[in-house]
Amino acid sequence: MAEDGLPKIYSHPPTESSKTPTAATIFFGADNAIPKSETTITSEGDHVTSVNEYMLESDFSTTTDNKLTAKKEKLKSEDDMGTDFIKSTTHLQKEITSLTGTTNSITRDSITEHFMPVKIGNISSPVTTVSLIDFSTDIAKEDILLATIDTGDAEISITSEVSGTLKDSSAGVADAPAFPRKKDEADMSNYNSSIKSNVPADEAVQVTDSTIPEAEIPPAPEESFTTIPDITALEEEKITEIDLSVLEDDTSAVATLTDSDEKFITVFELTTSAEKDKDKREDTLLTDEETTEGASIWMERDTANEAETHSVLLTAVESRYDFVVPASIATNLVEESSTEEDLSETDNTETVPKITEPFSGTTSVLDTPDYKEDTSTTETDIFELLKEEPDEFMI
């Protein structure tokens, strides 16, 4: 037992190489009692060292002094101050200082090697890793940074104080770090501790690399990865498709369109001339050059083949439907519109009779020879569908 209340832990170097690090593991588990056992630490140089047995007398989770008992000799020291240090012996003069920054010295050298396994609280998985420290022979004092794994969002500072008596190779520990009590995950952020060692030159110390097996390290909670869903497992988007094609044998297709279908119709023209009104040029799907050339070719073909059957160029600009106008209905539409427009003084009345001749032999736009004329459909139904008057057509 050190007079200053410090546990004294010393070790001797491996026989193979003093710089060969030995591997030690610190486990933080749910158990507060450490059974007596003998552990071997094997370094890369095949140096095997026996570790003394310890048994925990009280709970580590409290902030009062706790004691680890073993079966070795009692050690004495000259200070009675409570500090946060672990003192070692080596041929180098080192000083290990914790966060409180207090330094003490030791006077005894007849100290054997000890290793303390530690279990704190109810943590079932390890939460920290100690880095390898390799002392060189030409450095007197040096700050050693020990970093831990970033395992959470909360910031926890280690302010533990190591005190007590080293009786029969026993050590006392007070103020264990306040680790979270969750078993599934550790909520602890990065914290650093500065350590210095102050040891006599007649002893040798081998600082070990305390590591934790990879299988026991819990994943950091903040490193959450978004799982990409399987594209093949996604449900196919349902798209409602409406087939609005007019069947050849459906003679009442034009008359049976509902009011909800009428709102999509914006322009509906019957064109047979090369000239169109300048105000309606934006309604055509062709450019100015293509429109003029296409219309000229159309009119030339009509002029050369007047005896043949002519079809009506039916344009539904910005419309979603293809309309089929029977020949009889088209003829009746033109004759009726000619009578009404002759009574009004407009510029369009003179051009109406010119369309009667192509309409007399009109076939459907689909050019189907088996198409049946719809004798039950009248021009009134067509205009009710379009909600327009005959004189509004640009002919």
Curated annotation (Swiss-Prot):
The modification Phosphoserine is found at residues 273, 319, 376. PANTHER family: CALCIUM-BINDING AND SPERMATID-SPECIFIC PROTEIN 1, TESTIS DEVELOPMENT PROTEIN NYD-SP26. It is found in: Cytoplasm; Mitochondrion inner membrane; Cell projection, Cilium, Flagellum; Cytoplasmic vesicle, Secretory vesicle, Acrosome. The modification Phosphothreonine is found at residue 287. Residues 1-20, 335-379 are annotated as: Disordered. It comes from the Eukaryota. It comes from Homo sapiens. This is Calcium-binding and spermatid-specific protein 1. The gene is CABS1.
